[in-house]
UniProtKB/Swiss-Prot annotation:
It comes from the Bacteria. Pathway: Amino-sugar metabolism; N-acetylneuraminate degradation; D-fructose 6-phosphate from N-acetylneuraminate: step 5/5. This is Glucosamine-6-phosphate deaminase. It comes from Bifidobacterium longum (strain DJO10A). HAMAP family: GlcN6P_deamin. Keywords: Carbohydrate metabolism, Hydrolase. One of its GO terms (biological process) is N-acetylglucosamine catabolic process. GO terms for cellular component: cytoplasm. The keyword Coiled coil does not apply. It catalyses: alpha-D-glucosamine 6-phosphate + H2O = beta-D-fructose 6-phosphate + NH4(+).
Amino acid sequence: MPEIIIVKNEAEAGEIYGRCVADLIKAKPDAVLGLATGSSPLAAYQALAKIVKDEAIDVSGVRGFALDEYIGLPLTHPESYHATIHRTVVEPLGLDPAKVHVPGDVLNGTPLEDGDKIALAGPAYDRAIEAAGGIDVQILGIGTDGHVGFNEPGSSLASGTRVKTLAEQTRIDNARFFDNDINQVPTHCITQGIGTIMKARHLVLLAFGAGKAEAIEETVEGGVSAFCPASALQMHPHATIIVDEEAASRLRHKDYYRYAYTHKPAWQGI
């Protein structure tokens, strides 16, 4: 069962994540961070960047692996996840760009029709993560349908990094990054699988707003099912889910989650 932390707002969630990762980097200067895009992690990255600056933490050895990338977008496209990770993580934290990887880096706009090249990219990415020693902390968002990364409902809970077709709901949700034009949103992606994600030593999932309440309810208190990919976190030995009041609104046991976190010894961290 993941630890559930209910916070007032995204800034408070960001501070919890930022302190967790900053302490990790201090203890392990070559830490491997799992990175996600979307709006949910932004406050977390901002909080971490502030701590790194305020405490003069050396991040020169930190490595990173992103969750996913669109198929068909060149790396220079402003909404490619290569560009997004560089803009929201690499630059603010001062990471070495050569040590931060995105699954589509070797594809760089390769069209979907080039199946031979695309098919090899997923297994190669999993091998690169393993060669780095695995992910220490993986940050995650969650879709309104319970997807994590681009693992849509119905994805295998044992899957590795591979090419997937984006669900229509995901394309609708992501159209806000493409001038609200769904026709600009790619139809395919390459994503870490649930099996790959579950190998990370610590998972931290963030969710905010009433629109995520049903997905959080299914993730935390529903059954483990491929039709809610995030529900796999119930099986992880060290998973933390940080939500605001609106995202937690459908949780039946939220009073217990608050009680447990309030009485948790500080030395345990998250």
